[in-house]
C-alpha cells in the first residue's frame, strides 16, 4: 500500500513535515568536499519536494521522482526542478546520468536489492547514492514523560505499519550491486513545535495515515485526540518546545 498516495496525505505532508533537509545537505557537502555544484542530482521518493529543493544548493540540475502523483502535484509548484512519477526500482532515466542520487526517509518502503541495482545503473562512475533518515523517537527537551506517552499511548493506538527496517548494509549485499558503504553518520536534529505544529507533523506519519485510509478513523478525529493528549506538554497554544529527531546518513559509492 502507498500510504502517501492520496491528496489529503500529500497536503498534510507538505504542511506538517519539518524542513531539516538543508542541515543534512550541509553534512553531505562537507563529506563529499564539494566546492562547486554537481551537474545533476536525483531525489527518489521525493514526496512533495522538500528534500528535492534542498539539492539546489549542491546541484545545477535537480530531478525528483515519486510513486504518488498527488505528492508531485504539490511539488510541481517549485520552479527549476523536473519531477515525474516513477517507482524507486524503475527510473525513467538513461544509464550513468547522475552525479548524485538521494533518498530521504523512504528507503524502508522499497525492494532494496532492486533499488540498489537501479541506483547503480543511474549513477556515473564513482558517484554516490546517499540515503538518509530523520526519525522521530519521541524525545522532547526537558520532558521525559513525552517519551513514555509516545511509546505507551500514541504508538499503541496507532502502531507503525510493516516496513523494511531490517536490511543488512553489508558487503555481501552491496558488492553484487557494485556498491560500497563508505560511511554511516548519525546526529540529532532539534526541531521546535507548538502543539498545533506537532499535531500537524504526527498526522503525516504512516501509522496515522493507515487507519485513515482503512476508514477506522478520520483525520479530524485524530487531530482532536492529539490536541487533547498533547495539551499537557504545552503551557498554551503559542508555547514552542524542542523535539529531537535522530538523523542518519549512509554514503554508498558506485564501484
Which stretches of residues belong to each language-model region?
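Conserved class I S-adenosyl-L-methionine
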Residues: 1-36
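Class I SAM-dependent methyltransferase SAM/SAH-binding core
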Residues: 40-44, 48-90
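Class I S-adenosylmethionine-dependent transferase superfamily signal
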Residues: 55, 118-119
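A short acidic, Gly/Pro-enriched loop at the edge of an enzyme's catalytic core
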Residues: 89-100
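Short catalytic micro-motifs in class I SAM-dependent methyltransferases
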Residues: 105-106
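A short, conserved alpha-helix within the catalytic core of class I
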Residues: 110-118
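Conserved catalytic/acceptor-binding region of the Class I
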Residues: 120, 125-194
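Conserved Class I S-adenosyl-L-methionine
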Residues: 168-255
Amino acid at each position: 500500500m502507498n500510504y502517501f498516495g492520496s491528496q489529503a496525505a500529500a497536503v498534510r505532508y507538505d504542511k506538517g513535515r519539518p524542513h531539516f533537509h538543508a542541515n543534512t545537505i550541509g553534512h553531505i557537502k562537507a563529506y563529499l568536499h564539494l566546492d562547486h555544484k554537481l551537474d545533476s542530482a536525483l531525489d527518489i521518493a521525493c514526496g512533495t519536494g522538500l528534500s528535492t529543493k534542498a539539492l539546489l544548493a549542491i546541484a545545477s540540475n535537480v530531478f525528483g521522482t515519486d510513486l504518488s502523483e498527488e505528492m508531485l502535484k504539490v511539488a510541481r509548484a517549485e520552479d527549476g526542478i523536473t519531477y515525474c512519477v516513477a517507482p524507486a526500482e524503475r527510473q525513467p532515466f538513461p544509464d550513468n546520468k547522475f552525479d548524485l542520487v538521494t533518498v530521504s526517509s523512504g528507503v524502508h518502503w522499497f525492494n532494496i536489492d532492486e533499488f540498489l541495482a537501479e541506483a547503480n545503473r543511474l549513477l556515473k562512475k564513482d558517484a554516490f547514492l546517499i540515503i538518509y533518515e530523520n526519525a522521530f523517537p519521541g524525545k522532547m527537551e526537558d520532558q521525559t514523560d513525552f517519551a513514555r506517552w509516545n511509546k505507551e499511548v500514541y504508538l499503541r493506538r496507532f502502531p507503525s505499519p510493516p516496513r523494511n527496517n531490517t536490511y543488512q548494509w553489508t558487503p555481501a549485499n552491496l558488492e553484487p550491486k557494485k556498491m560500497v558503504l563508505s560511511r554511516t553518520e548519525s546526529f540529532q536534529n532539534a526541531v521546535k513545535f507548538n502543539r498545533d505544529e506537532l499535531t500537524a507533523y504526527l498526522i503525516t506519519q504512516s501509522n496515522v495515515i493507515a487507519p485513515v485510509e482503512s476508514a477506522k478513523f478520520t483525520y479530524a478525529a485524530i487531530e482532536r485526540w492529539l490536541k487533547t493528549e498533547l495539551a499537557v506538554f504545552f503551557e498554551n497554544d503559542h508555547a514552542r518546545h524542542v523535539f529531537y529527531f535522530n538523523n542518519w546518513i549512509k554514503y554508498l559509492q558506485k564501484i
